[in-house]
Amino acid sequence: MREAFLVDENSGEKYSLSEPRWCSDTKSPLNFSEVKGITPDLIKSAEKSIWRYKSAFPCKIPEPVSLGEGCTPLVPFSFRERRALFKLEWFSPTGSFKDRGASVMMSFLKQQNIKEVVEDSSGNGGAAIAAYGAAAGISVNIVTPSNASAPKISQIKAYGAKVHLVPGSREETEQAALEMAKSVFYASHNWHPFFLQGTKTLGYELWEDLNFKAPDNIIIPTGAGSNVLGCY
């Protein structure tokens, strides 16, 4: 099998996975040259985390950084007089689905020997990257709006991350993080292509939970859309 690489789908520019980067030279998002799928026989059923689907990741990561993310309950319930199945992602280690993306992204950054990262987040993304950064031995800076939830800021700090409060809008927070990213690697859950490799495992889990059949429909609450993009 050919080695995967990163590609800017706007320009066609290609980048090796050996080069730490989160965007193209023209600041466009990056995707993988090949998006691998998986068959039931490739699932590592003894692994009780998203790493049971590691055969679907674009490259080998021999030493994953895992806190037991994934394998969350799928619970039947009545919703507007219809039968629905609820995926309880709040059972994740830090309380959200973003642990899936953080696990794969931080595992890959550790493999690339990244020592310090910065991320802009108003809550769950920052908590996930702070936790998995601590598990990976990577120093984490979280840039967050000054009006962010106090309990969420406390959670981020509890994992040992440095919190940088920015007055103003969410966009101003992102700009502050990008300024810091001139000297520290930008581990953005909205930009780094390996983050979606983690969130896509939600789709594999639903498929496996339903005896390897896709659900009729998936309803996903969304902000930036990483859960939707992962399942897609």
Tell me the role of every PLM-derived stretch:
Residues M1-Y232:
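PLP-dependent amino-acid enzyme catalytic core
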